[in-house]
Protein backbone atom coordinates (compact mmCIF):
# COMPACT_ATOMS: atom_id res chain seq x y z
CA UNK A 1 0.00 0.00 0.00
CA UNK A 2 1.32 3.49 -0.82
CA UNK A 3 2.37 5.23 2.39
CA UNK A 4 2.98 8.89 3.20
CA UNK A 5 6.03 9.39 0.91
CA UNK A 6 4.29 7.79 -2.07
CA UNK A 7 1.10 9.79 -1.56
CA UNK A 8 3.13 12.98 -1.06
CA UNK A 9 5.02 12.23 -4.29
CA UNK A 10 1.70 11.99 -6.13
CA UNK A 11 0.47 15.20 -4.47
CA UNK A 12 3.55 17.11 -5.61
CA UNK A 13 2.99 15.85 -9.14
CA UNK A 14 -0.68 16.85 -9.08
CA UNK A 15 0.22 20.33 -7.86
CA UNK A 16 2.50 20.81 -10.86
CA UNK A 17 0.13 19.69 -13.60
CA UNK A 18 -3.48 20.11 -12.45
CA UNK A 19 -3.69 23.28 -10.33
CA UNK A 20 -5.54 25.89 -12.36
CA UNK A 21 -6.79 23.25 -14.79
CA UNK A 22 -10.51 22.93 -15.48
CA UNK A 23 -12.20 19.54 -15.61
CA UNK A 24 -14.00 19.33 -18.95
CA UNK A 25 -15.70 16.00 -18.26
CA UNK A 26 -15.05 12.44 -17.27
CA UNK A 27 -16.32 8.90 -16.99
CA UNK A 28 -16.52 6.26 -14.29
CA UNK A 29 -15.61 2.81 -15.58
CA UNK A 30 -15.95 1.05 -12.23
CA UNK A 31 -18.77 2.48 -10.07
CA UNK A 32 -17.52 0.88 -6.83
CA UNK A 33 -14.52 3.21 -6.91
CA UNK A 34 -16.84 6.13 -6.13
CA UNK A 35 -17.39 6.17 -2.37
CA UNK A 36 -19.47 9.37 -2.46
CA UNK A 37 -21.91 10.35 -3.82
CA UNK A 38 -23.70 7.08 -4.49
CA UNK A 39 -24.30 7.92 -8.13
CA UNK A 40 -21.26 7.95 -10.47
CA UNK A 41 -23.21 10.34 -12.68
CA UNK A 42 -23.57 12.83 -9.82
CA UNK A 43 -19.85 12.42 -9.11
CA UNK A 44 -18.93 13.47 -12.66
CA UNK A 45 -21.56 16.23 -12.72
CA UNK A 46 -20.15 17.66 -9.50
CA UNK A 47 -16.66 17.84 -11.00
CA UNK A 48 -17.75 19.15 -14.41
CA UNK A 49 -16.24 22.60 -15.15
CA UNK A 50 -14.53 22.74 -11.74
CA UNK A 51 -10.93 23.96 -11.42
CA UNK A 52 -8.31 22.53 -9.07
CA UNK A 53 -7.21 25.22 -6.61
CA UNK A 54 -4.69 23.17 -4.63
CA UNK A 55 -3.87 19.69 -3.40
CA UNK A 56 -3.27 18.66 0.19
CA UNK A 57 -2.42 15.37 1.85
CA UNK A 58 -3.80 14.09 5.13
CA UNK A 59 -2.21 10.81 6.12
CA UNK A 60 -2.64 8.65 3.02
CA UNK A 61 -5.58 10.69 1.71
CA UNK A 62 -5.37 13.23 -1.13
CA UNK A 63 -7.74 16.20 -1.14
CA UNK A 64 -8.18 18.95 -3.70
CA UNK A 65 -10.25 22.06 -3.18
CA UNK A 66 -12.29 22.91 -6.27
CA UNK A 67 -13.74 26.13 -7.63
CA UNK A 68 -15.79 27.27 -10.60
CA UNK A 69 -14.51 29.99 -12.90
CA UNK A 70 -16.84 32.39 -11.09
CA UNK A 71 -14.71 31.77 -7.96
CA UNK A 72 -17.64 30.02 -6.32
CA UNK A 73 -16.60 26.92 -4.37
CA UNK A 74 -17.45 23.63 -6.05
CA UNK A 75 -16.50 21.26 -3.26
CA UNK A 76 -13.62 18.83 -2.88
CA UNK A 77 -12.20 15.82 -4.68
CA UNK A 78 -10.88 13.13 -2.35
CA UNK A 79 -8.73 10.13 -3.30
CA UNK A 80 -7.32 7.16 -1.39
CA UNK A 81 -5.01 4.86 -3.37
CA UNK A 82 -5.40 1.93 -0.93
CA UNK A 83 -3.28 -1.04 -2.05
CA UNK A 84 -2.73 -0.66 -5.79
CA UNK A 85 -4.23 2.68 -6.83
CA UNK A 86 -2.36 4.92 -9.27
CA UNK A 87 -3.11 8.42 -10.55
CA UNK A 88 -1.62 8.92 -14.00
CA UNK A 89 -1.41 12.13 -16.06
CA UNK A 90 -1.58 11.00 -19.68
CA UNK A 91 -2.75 11.96 -23.16
CA UNK A 92 -6.40 11.14 -23.83
CA UNK A 93 -5.48 9.18 -26.95
CA UNK A 94 -3.12 6.90 -24.99
CA UNK A 95 -4.52 3.34 -24.80
CA UNK A 96 -6.63 2.90 -21.68
CA UNK A 97 -4.95 0.59 -19.16
CA UNK A 98 -6.77 -2.61 -18.25
CA UNK A 99 -7.54 -1.57 -14.68
CA UNK A 100 -8.56 2.05 -15.34
CA UNK A 101 -11.46 2.93 -13.02
CA UNK A 102 -12.05 6.69 -13.49
CA UNK A 103 -11.05 9.17 -16.20
CA UNK A 104 -11.12 12.98 -15.85
CA UNK A 105 -10.66 15.02 -19.03
CA UNK A 106 -8.89 18.36 -19.45
CA UNK A 107 -7.96 20.70 -22.29
CA UNK A 108 -4.99 20.05 -24.57
CA UNK A 109 -5.86 16.35 -24.84
CA UNK A 110 -4.77 15.67 -21.23
CA UNK A 111 -6.38 13.28 -18.80
CA UNK A 112 -6.09 12.16 -15.17
CA UNK A 113 -6.67 8.44 -14.83
CA UNK A 114 -7.28 6.44 -11.69
CA UNK A 115 -5.90 2.94 -12.28
CA UNK A 116 -6.43 0.31 -9.60
CA UNK A 117 -5.86 -3.41 -10.08
CA UNK A 118 -7.21 -4.58 -6.71
CA UNK A 119 -10.21 -2.18 -6.80
CA UNK A 120 -9.86 -1.11 -3.15
CA UNK A 121 -9.09 2.52 -4.04
CA UNK A 122 -11.74 5.17 -3.49
CA UNK A 123 -12.72 8.60 -4.77
CA UNK A 124 -15.12 11.16 -3.30
CA UNK A 125 -16.77 14.31 -4.58
CA UNK A 126 -17.71 16.39 -1.56
CA UNK A 127 -20.30 19.06 -2.34
CA UNK A 128 -19.70 22.69 -1.22
CA UNK A 129 -22.41 22.28 1.41
CA UNK A 130 -20.72 19.21 2.92
CA UNK A 131 -17.79 18.82 5.31
CA UNK A 132 -14.99 16.59 3.95
CA UNK A 133 -14.33 15.22 7.45
CA UNK A 134 -17.94 14.08 7.70
CA UNK A 135 -18.13 12.59 4.21
CA UNK A 136 -14.68 10.95 4.23
CA UNK A 137 -15.04 9.32 7.63
CA UNK A 138 -11.45 8.05 7.76
CA UNK A 139 -10.20 11.62 8.14
CA UNK A 140 -11.72 11.81 11.61
CA UNK A 141 -9.61 8.89 12.86
CA UNK A 142 -6.17 10.16 11.87
CA UNK A 143 -3.49 11.10 14.34
CA UNK A 144 -1.06 13.99 13.85
CA UNK A 145 1.06 14.38 10.75
CA UNK A 146 4.68 13.26 11.33
CA UNK A 147 6.02 16.65 10.24
CA UNK A 148 3.63 18.65 12.41
CA UNK A 149 4.24 20.27 15.79
CA UNK A 150 1.53 18.03 17.23
CA UNK A 151 3.79 15.01 16.71
CA UNK A 152 6.02 16.01 19.59
CA UNK A 153 8.18 13.81 21.79
CA UNK A 154 5.78 14.40 24.68
CA UNK A 155 2.77 13.39 22.58
CA UNK A 156 4.53 10.29 21.27
CA UNK A 157 5.75 9.22 24.70
CA UNK A 158 2.39 9.71 26.38
CA UNK A 159 0.56 7.89 23.57
CA UNK A 160 2.76 4.81 23.96
CA UNK A 161 2.64 4.60 27.75
CA UNK A 162 0.71 1.67 29.15
CA UNK A 163 0.31 -0.05 25.79
CA UNK A 164 1.29 -3.70 25.81
CA UNK A 165 1.11 -4.26 22.07
CA UNK A 166 4.25 -4.24 19.96
CA UNK A 167 5.72 -0.96 18.78
CA UNK A 168 5.42 -2.19 15.18
CA UNK A 169 1.68 -2.68 15.66
CA UNK A 170 1.38 0.78 17.22
CA UNK A 171 3.14 2.47 14.31
CA UNK A 172 0.66 0.94 11.87
CA UNK A 173 -2.20 2.56 13.81
CA UNK A 174 -3.13 5.68 11.84
CA UNK A 175 -4.69 7.16 14.97
CA UNK A 176 -1.23 7.34 16.55
CA UNK A 177 0.58 9.00 13.65
CA UNK A 178 -0.83 9.46 10.16
CA UNK A 179 0.80 8.06 7.06
CA UNK A 180 3.30 5.53 8.44
CA UNK A 181 2.82 2.01 7.09
CA UNK A 182 4.65 -1.29 6.92
CA UNK A 183 7.70 -0.15 4.95
CA UNK A 184 8.60 2.92 6.96
CA UNK A 185 7.71 1.39 10.32
CA UNK A 186 10.36 -1.28 9.68
CA UNK A 187 12.87 1.29 8.44
CA UNK A 188 12.36 3.70 11.35
CA UNK A 189 12.61 0.91 13.91
CA UNK A 190 15.92 -0.20 12.41
CA UNK A 191 17.26 3.35 12.39
CA UNK A 192 16.35 3.72 16.06
CA UNK A 193 17.73 0.26 16.98
CA UNK A 194 14.41 -1.03 18.33
CA UNK A 195 13.21 -4.62 17.78
CA UNK A 196 9.72 -4.50 16.17
CA UNK A 197 8.35 -6.96 18.74
CA UNK A 198 9.21 -4.68 21.67
CA UNK A 199 6.13 -3.80 23.73
CA UNK A 200 5.32 -0.10 23.77
CA UNK A 201 5.40 0.14 27.56
CA UNK A 202 8.96 -1.25 27.62
CA UNK A 203 10.39 1.64 25.60
CA UNK A 204 12.60 4.17 27.34
CA UNK A 205 12.31 7.91 26.79
CA UNK A 206 15.48 8.10 24.69
CA UNK A 207 14.23 5.25 22.48
CA UNK A 208 10.98 7.09 21.82
CA UNK A 209 12.96 10.23 20.98
CA UNK A 210 15.15 8.29 18.55
CA UNK A 211 12.14 6.64 16.96
CA UNK A 212 10.34 9.94 16.40
CA UNK A 213 13.47 11.39 14.79
CA UNK A 214 13.88 8.28 12.62
CA UNK A 215 10.26 8.42 11.43
CA UNK A 216 10.66 12.01 10.29
CA UNK A 217 14.05 11.30 8.70
CA UNK A 218 13.05 8.21 6.73
CA UNK A 219 9.85 9.80 5.46
CA UNK A 220 11.76 12.88 4.31
CA UNK A 221 14.41 10.75 2.61
CA UNK A 222 11.82 8.67 0.79
CA UNK A 223 9.91 11.73 -0.41
CA UNK A 224 13.18 13.01 -1.85
CA UNK A 225 13.61 9.66 -3.63
CA UNK A 226 10.10 9.70 -5.06
CA UNK A 227 8.79 7.01 -2.72
CA UNK A 228 9.18 3.24 -2.82
CA UNK A 229 8.11 0.84 -5.56
CA UNK A 230 8.08 -2.83 -4.61
CA UNK A 231 5.01 -3.71 -6.69
CA UNK A 232 2.40 -1.23 -7.90
CA UNK A 233 3.35 2.31 -6.92
CA UNK A 234 4.05 4.78 -9.73
CA UNK A 235 4.20 8.55 -9.71
CA UNK A 236 1.98 10.73 -11.92
CA UNK A 237 4.17 10.01 -14.95
CA UNK A 238 4.24 6.27 -14.32
CA UNK A 239 7.78 6.32 -12.90
CA UNK A 240 8.89 4.00 -10.08
CA UNK A 241 10.01 5.34 -6.71
CA UNK A 242 13.71 5.00 -5.85
CA UNK A 243 13.77 4.49 -2.07
CA UNK A 244 13.60 0.68 -2.33
CA UNK A 245 17.24 0.48 -3.38
CA UNK A 246 18.21 2.50 -0.30
CA UNK A 247 16.18 0.51 2.24
CA UNK A 248 17.93 -0.63 5.40
CA UNK A 249 15.82 -3.72 6.09
CA UNK A 250 12.49 -3.72 4.26
CA UNK A 251 12.45 -6.29 1.47
CA UNK A 252 16.04 -7.34 2.27
CA UNK A 253 15.41 -10.61 4.15
CA UNK A 254 18.34 -13.00 3.78
CA UNK A 255 20.71 -10.20 2.80
CA UNK A 256 23.50 -8.78 4.99
CA UNK A 257 22.73 -5.79 7.18
CA UNK A 258 24.21 -2.63 5.69
CA UNK A 259 25.55 -1.71 9.15
CA UNK A 260 26.84 -4.91 10.77
CA UNK A 261 26.69 -7.64 8.14
CA UNK A 262 24.26 -9.83 10.09
CA UNK A 263 21.52 -11.47 8.02
CA UNK A 264 18.27 -9.52 7.85
CA UNK A 265 15.32 -11.55 9.15
CA UNK A 266 11.64 -11.45 8.26
CA UNK A 267 8.80 -12.52 10.54
CA UNK A 268 5.03 -12.13 10.58
CA UNK A 269 3.81 -9.59 13.12
CA UNK A 270 0.18 -8.45 13.36
CA UNK A 271 -0.32 -10.16 10.01
CA UNK A 272 2.36 -8.10 8.26
CA UNK A 273 5.81 -9.00 6.98
CA UNK A 274 8.28 -7.43 9.39
CA UNK A 275 12.00 -7.00 8.71
CA UNK A 276 14.79 -6.38 11.21
CA UNK A 277 18.46 -6.98 12.00
CA UNK A 278 18.90 -9.26 15.05
CA UNK A 279 22.26 -7.63 15.81
CA UNK A 280 21.40 -3.94 15.44
CA UNK A 281 17.93 -4.37 16.96
CA UNK A 282 18.47 -6.57 20.03
CA UNK A 283 15.61 -7.98 22.06
CA UNK A 284 14.60 -5.92 25.06
UniProtKB/Swiss-Prot annotation:
Cofactor note: Binds 1 zinc ion per subunit.
Residues given in the record as DNA binding sites: 99, 118, 163
Cofactor or coenzyme needed: Zn(2+)
UniProt KW DNA-binding keyword: yes
One Pfam family linked to the record: Fapy_DNA_glyco
Catalytic activity of the protein: Hydrolysis of DNA containing ring-opened 7-methylguanine residues, releasing 2,6-diamino-4-hydroxy-5-(N-methyl)formamidopyrimidine; 2'-deoxyribonucleotide-(2'-deoxyribose 5'-phosphate)-2'-deoxyribonucleotide-DNA = a 3'-end 2'-deoxyribonucleotide-(2,3-dehydro-2,3-deoxyribose 5'-phosphate)-DNA + a 5'-end 5'-phospho-2'-deoxyribonucleoside-DNA + H(+)
Any one GO BP annotation for this protein: base-excision repair
Keywords of the record: DNA damage, DNA repair, DNA-binding, Glycosidase, Hydrolase, Lyase, Metal-binding, Multifunctional enzyme, Zinc, Zinc-finger
Assembly and interaction partners: Monomer.
The protein's role, per its UniProt record: Involved in base excision repair of DNA damaged by oxidation or by mutagenic agents. Acts as a DNA glycosylase that recognizes and removes damaged bases. Has a preference for oxidized purines, such as 7,8-dihydro-8-oxoguanine (8-oxoG). Has AP (apurinic/apyrimidinic) lyase activity and introduces nicks in the DNA strand. Cleaves the DNA backbone by beta-delta elimination to generate a single-strand break at the site of the removed base with both 3'- and 5'-phosphates.
Protein name, entry field: Formamidopyrimidine-DNA glycosylase
Species for this entry: Acaryochloris marina (strain MBIC 11017)
Amino acid sequence: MPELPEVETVRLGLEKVTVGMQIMGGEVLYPRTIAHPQSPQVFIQGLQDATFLSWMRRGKYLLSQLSFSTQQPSGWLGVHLRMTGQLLWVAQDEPVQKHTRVRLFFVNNRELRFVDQRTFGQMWWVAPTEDPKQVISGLQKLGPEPFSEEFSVDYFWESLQGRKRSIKSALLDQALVAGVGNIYADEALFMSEIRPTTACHQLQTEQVQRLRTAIIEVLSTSIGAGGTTFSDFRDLKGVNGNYGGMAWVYGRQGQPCRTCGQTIERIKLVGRSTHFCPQCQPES
